[in-house]
Structure formats: C-alpha cells, structure tokens
Amino acid sequence: YPRTDARVLSSAVAKEIYKNIGGLNNYTPLSGFANEIMQGKKYQGIIKSKYVDDKKITDHYAIIPTGQAVGSLSRISEMGQKVYDVIARRFLSIFMPPAVYLKIKLETQTKGEAFFANFKMLKHPGYLKVTGMGGQKKEAQLTEEQIHAISSLKKGMPLPVKDYTIKDGTTSAPKRYNSGSLILAMENAGQLIEDEDLR
C-alpha cells in the first residue's frame, strides 16, 4: 500500500501484532531481536502506546512487515531489500525500551575565562540496537579511557588544563531539501514562524 502516510497502527492490527513479529523470526538479520521481543512478550502493551491510534488512520495504517515470504527477498532488487530492512528494523524498534544517554556539560574556568564542553554518551542502547543508529560522531571519537574519565567527574571538581588548541571553523548552509524533507517542511511550515500573529 505505497500511498499511505500513516505513522500509526489500528487497534485491530495491534491485537495480532505478535504474528508479524513472529514472522520476522525467519528474517536472519533481525531474528534475534524478533525472538527477544516474542520471548519477553514486549508487544503486549502496544495497544495503549502512541503507535496505535484509530483516529489518525485515513486510508491505511502504517506500513509494517508481515514476515511472510521472507525467503523471497533474494528475488527483489538490492534497493528493495534495503527498504524492507529499514521498515522491519523500524517496526521492531517500537517494542524495545528507549535509548538512555548520559549528558555531561563541562564548564571550566581559567584566568577569568570560562570554557564549555558538552558530551553525550550512550548508556543503554535500547531500540538503537535494532535500528543500528547508535554510533554518534562524538561518541565514536571517545576512547574507553576518556569515557571512564568523563563518567567519574563530579560537580565542582578542579581539573588541570594540560593542553589546548584553537580550531578555526565556519558555519555551513542548511542542507538542501529533498522530496521527503520538503513534504515534512510543508506539513510543519508554521513551526518555523516565530511571530505568534503570523503563525
């Protein structure tokens, strides 16, 4: 059903969602996650979640994998296989717990000048295990030793400054719109207007 823009499921589908999850046990890249969800019965609370809302459905509920004919995936194009994988990962991720990040804000003062640094570290991956989107740039650059050092910081702790560098940089223009981002921007155009009277 390629024309639906629904992002939620109907309550009727939600009642039998375990069938879709069970079908993904045969999809090798995600079978472990599907099995974890089925074994822990993590699908049971879905009907009361934000992912189920009959009022928001127009023609069809959100696209979800049926789990049927997984063996036939090799017959479709590579792009089609990737689309299926994205949809299946997104679908299974709604049954996983949220990702938990540790946010650290450092303020250091030396000779009357204040310097700020912000860090965001992934503490528990949650649904990011399924989507595979947990690798943030800042996180990837931190070593285990640095993560341990940052985690052990306490408020008011004095820190010695061993070295510093000056980095020149320029701001970059916003990314160009593509067909997907343009539609979202048009749907939410009022959010960009700061003047309440114009909004």
Please tell me what each predicted stretch does.
Residues Y1-R199:
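Core catalytic DNA strand-manipulation module of type IA topoisomerases
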